[in-house]
Amino acid sequence: MAKLRVSYEYTEAEDKSIRLGLFLIVSGILSLFIFGFCWLSPALQDLQATAANCTVLSVQQIGEVFECTFTCGTDCRGTSQYPCVQVYVNNSESNSRALLHSDQHQLLTNPKCSYIPPCKRENQKNSESVMNWQQYWKDEIGSQPFTCYFNQHQRPEDVLLQRTHDEIALLHCFLWPVVAFVVGVLIVVLTICAKSLAVKAEAMKKRKFS
């Protein structure tokens, strides 16, 4: 009976296989939770945006300045300021006035402005970046129609110039955690089943020769 108990013990290779399977299962579950809570909501809002044609109504600075954070090395950080420019457009789908934003991230970071420049240490460089962007919309785009994206149910008063996420990125972010979970389950189940079959075969052999 003692020998039969010993035969149920897993070998070092089997133990490593089960540990690997459990690691993949836990990693897959944690990845799904992380993506679900931290990334899924803004991504779905972005993907729910409908494409439309927009034309510029006005481009202007509103006289307010906002802070941004710049980096100047590994342990070097600071804040500087940039002026707020607003680009109002006409949305062809709803035929209404809306504030243009670069993308979903910019909208969530500063919903009052249309553009956030790459943050530099000098305020003057930030102002120049905003001015160049403002002139681009005034002179080069003007009244030309362009593609924009809006979500009538979430933020009908805002439109996006581009989407940050697409369906392929969303698929990959959920595909690989699920694959890791399934592979982990298969490794654990197959290892346990293989061990169980080996133990049964050993028991049958002992009964046969006893």
UniProtKB/Swiss-Prot annotation:
Family membership: Belongs to the KCNMB (TC 8.A.14.1) family. KCNMB4 subfamily.
Domain free text: Resistance to charybdotoxin (CTX) toxin is mediated by the extracellular domain.
Ranges in the topological domain labelled Cytoplasmic: 1-19, 189-210
Residues carrying covalently attached carbohydrate according to the record: 53, 90
Superkingdom in the source lineage: Eukaryota
GO molecular function terms noted in the UniProt entry: calcium-activated potassium channel activity; potassium channel activity; voltage-gated monoatomic ion channel activity involved in regulation of presynaptic membrane potential
InterPro entries tied to this protein: K_chnl_Ca-activ_BK_bsu
UniProt membrane topology term: Multi-pass membrane protein
Stored Pfam families: CaKB
Localization in the cell: Membrane
The protein's name: Calcium-activated potassium channel subunit beta-4
Summary of the function given for this chain in its UniProt record: Regulatory subunit of the calcium activated potassium KCNMA1 (maxiK) channel. Modulates the calcium sensitivity and gating kinetics of KCNMA1, thereby contributing to KCNMA1 channel diversity. Decreases the gating kinetics and calcium sensitivity of the KCNMA1 channel, but with fast deactivation kinetics. May decrease KCNMA1 channel openings at low calcium concentrations but increases channel openings at high calcium concentrations. Makes KCNMA1 channel resistant to 100 nM charybdotoxin (CTX) toxin concentrations.
Name of encoding gene: Kcnmb4
GO biological process: action potential; detection of calcium ion; neuronal action potential; potassium ion transport
Subunit comment: Interacts with KCNMA1 tetramer. There are probably 4 molecules of KCMNB4 per KCNMA1 tetramer. Interacts with FMR1 (via N-terminus).
Cystine connections: none
Statement: the UniProt record of this protein carries the keyword Glycoprotein: yes
Mod. after translation: Phosphorylated. Phosphorylation modulates its effect on KCNMA1 activation kinetics. N-glycosylated. A highly glycosylated form is promoted by KCNMA1. Glycosylation, which is not required for the interaction with KCNMA1 and subcellular location, increases protection against charybdotoxin.
Alphabetized UniProt keyword annotations: Glycoprotein, Ion channel, Ion transport, Membrane, Phosphoprotein, Transmembrane, Transmembrane helix, Transport
Segments on the Extracellular face: 41-167
Listed GO CC annotations: plasma membrane; voltage-gated potassium channel complex
Main location class: membrane
Source organism of the structure: Mus musculus
